[in-house]
Swiss-Prot record:
Entry keyword set: ATP-binding, Cell inner membrane, Cell membrane, Ion transport, Membrane, Nucleotide-binding, Potassium, Potassium transport, Transmembrane, Transmembrane helix, Transport
Localization per Swiss-Prot or TrEMBL: Cell inner membrane
SUBUNIT field: The system is composed of three essential subunits: KdpA, KdpB and KdpC.
Molecular function terms from GO: ATP binding; P-type potassium transmembrane transporter activity
Protein task: Part of the high-affinity ATP-driven potassium transport (or Kdp) system, which catalyzes the hydrolysis of ATP coupled with the electrogenic transport of potassium into the cytoplasm. This subunit acts as a catalytic chaperone that increases the ATP-binding affinity of the ATP-hydrolyzing subunit KdpB by the formation of a transient KdpB/KdpC/ATP ternary complex.
Name of the protein described by the UniProt record: Potassium-transporting ATPase KdpC subunit
Transmembrane segments: 18-38
Recorded GO CC terms: plasma membrane
Keyword NADP annotated: no
Length: 209
């Protein structure tokens, strides 16, 4: 008499269901909650977006660039996304693209006139857009070419503004990763604290959230 395999194996079915439940709740829910809790406890500032507050009011994020049009402020890199957090992107234009070359030429002339420097002295980062369009940093050189304009607009000595730039310059992470950089929002808020910036009022610092 021949034997046949059972059409239904309750033990295997039960094991599959238990594995599915564990995967769903154990890895999908519990792991996420634990990871979120640990992150919030150890890195509370970063976990909430590295928000920057002035007088308990959120004025932006240390991780996201925002536009500054007032001459009293250092200005960030150009943005293809127009500094819109929901539209982060670069232009994706090739270096040979005529539109890109024309825009760079126009921006070079604009920045040179704005900051009172020779066109060839304009750093490349002030002409080109970052990959995300939201890069919050400048190189020290990108900030230094703006010192004269900012100092004149605020009635501050250039040496005072230069010292603020130096103080705001961050070293490479762990001394190895990246390049020296200046967070534009942090520098502009430091300027307001230094004076002639009407800090806490209509100070040109856009509330990003």
């Amino acid at each position: 008499m021949s034997s046949s395999l059972p059409l239904r194996d309750d033990g295997a079915l039960r094991g599959s269901l238990m594995l599915a439940v564990f995967t769903l709740f154990g890895l999908g829910l519990a792991y996420s909650l634990v990871a979120t809790g640990i992150t919030g406890a150890l890195f509370s500032e970063q976990a909430t977006g590295s928000l920057v507050r002035v007088d308990a009011r959120v004025v932006g994020s240390a991780l996201v660039a925002q536009p500054f049009t007032d001459a009293r402020y250092f200005q960030p890199r150009p943005s293809a996304a127009k500094y819109d957090l929901t539209a982060a992107s670069g232009s994706n234009q090739a270096r040979s693209n005529p539109d890109l070359l024309a825009r760079i030429a126009a921006t070079r002339a604009q920045v040179a006139k704005r900051d009172g420097i020779a066109p060839e002295a304009v750093p490349g980062e002030l002409l080109t857009q970052s990959g995300s369009g939201l890069d919050p940093h400048l190189s020290p050189a990108g900030a230094q070419v703006q010192i004269r304009r900012v100092a004149a607009a605020r009635g501050l000595p250039e040496q005072r503004v230069a010292a603020l730039v130096q103080a705001a310059t961050e070293a490479p992470q762990f001394g190895l990763l990246g390049q020296p950089r200046v967070n534009v929002l942090a520098l502009n808020l430091a300027l307001d604290k230094a004076g002639n910036g009407e800090s806490g009022r209509d100070n040109g610092v856009k509330q990003a959230y």
